[in-house]
Structure formats: structure tokens, C-alpha cells
Regions:
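Catalytic core of bacterial c-di-GMP phosphodiesterases, primarily the EAL and HD-GYP domains
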Residues: 2-73, 146
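The catalytic core of metal-dependent phosphodiesterases that act on cyclic dinucleotides
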Residues: 44-118, 134, 138-166
Length: 166
């Protein structure tokens, strides 16, 4: 019920304030795994189809890894309605890079461990290069989060990343 209330508030906020940008809505593992919730959310998106493309539903990589098949179903159903999907705190210990093609994702927000001190760590640099290349092929936008160091920020600008947050 909490996730439903948040979604209703976000939809109203977008409509009332004529918001034009996308808004991400965090969902619980329980909601993503609940077929009744998925039916409800599909109806809510369809009722508000003019803003569907602005709704980005978010799950953690950990939640996705807990039930991959349910998440795939959820992502496919959300996309059928015109909304978007992001996996946040993405880590390969939960979802291997090779498995990204199995999901229908719009965005990946990387765990901050991948970018902290990246300018000094060749394995992190290789990872960012790999995920950037793969995401480009899969049409997924990559967002490194919470980059603190100016050197790391400058280094990340070399890659074809959608955005970097500080």
C-alpha cells in the first residue's frame, strides 16, 4: 500500500505541476513480486498515459537478484504501458554484466564503489569501459552516483555515460 500511495502522489505531482522531466519511484521487493500490484500499477499508468514516459520505476540490484524472473516480468509489463525501469546500486555480484541483455532496462545507476578512486584503479576503469560499451549496445543509460573526487569526475567524462551525480 505504501508504494501505491507514493505512485499516486508522484502522478498527481507531475500532473498538477506540469512537470516535464522523468521522476524515479523506488519500489519494494514485495511490490515487484506481487501480481496484484503489477496489475494495479499497469492500470494506473494506462489511466495516466500522457505522463507514462516520465515514470521511471526503480529497484535495487539486490532486489532484482532475489527473483530475476519476477523482475523480468515486471519490467516487461511496465514497458508495455510506456513507463521506464532503472536498476539502482548496480553491482556485478548481484547481476553479472553478461545478464544485462536479459533485462529490458532504460537506466542503470552504478554503485558508488565502482567510481570511488577510479582514476587510480585500472580494474574499475576497465569495468566502466565495459559497462559503457555494453550499455551503448543495449540502449541503456548509465548513471554513476555520488562521485566525490574532482579527478574521478574528470576521468568519468571520458566515457559515454548519460550523467554523473555528485
Amino acid at each position: 500500500d505504501f508504494d501505491k500511495k507514493v505512485i499516486e502522489k508522484v502522478v498527481q505531482h507531475i500532473i498538477i505541476n506540469s512537470i516535464k522531466h522523468d521522476i524515479s519511484i523506488n519500489l519494494s521487493l514485495e511490490s515487484i513480486n506481487n501480481t496484484a500490484f503489477i496489475a494495479w500499477i499497469k492500470n494506473k499508468i494506462i489511466e495516466n498515459k500522457t505522463i507514462a514516459a516520465q515514470l521511471v520505476f526503480s529497484a535495487t540490484a539486490y532486489a532484482v537478484a532475489k527473483n530475476v524472473d519476477k523482475f523480468k516480468f515486471f519490467a516487461d509489463e511496465i514497458h508495455k504501458c510506456g513507463a521506464k525501469i532503472i536498476i539502482k546500486r548496480f553491482e556485478t555480484k548481484f547481476i553479472p554484466l553478461g545478464n544485462l541483455k536479459d533485462f529490458n532496462l532504460d537506466y542503470i545507476r552504478l554503485a558508488r564503489d565502482y567510481t570511488c578512486d577510479i582514476c587510480k584503479d585500472h580494474s574499475k576503469q576497465s569495468f566502466i569501459e565495459s559497462i559503457s560499451d555494453l550499455a551503448g549496445l543495449l540502449n541503456i543509460k548509465v548513471l554513476p552516483e555520488n562521485v566525490k573526487d574532482d579527478e574521478d569526475m574528470e576521468f568519468l567524462k571520458k566515457y559515454n555515460l548519460y550523467a554523473v551525480s555528485r
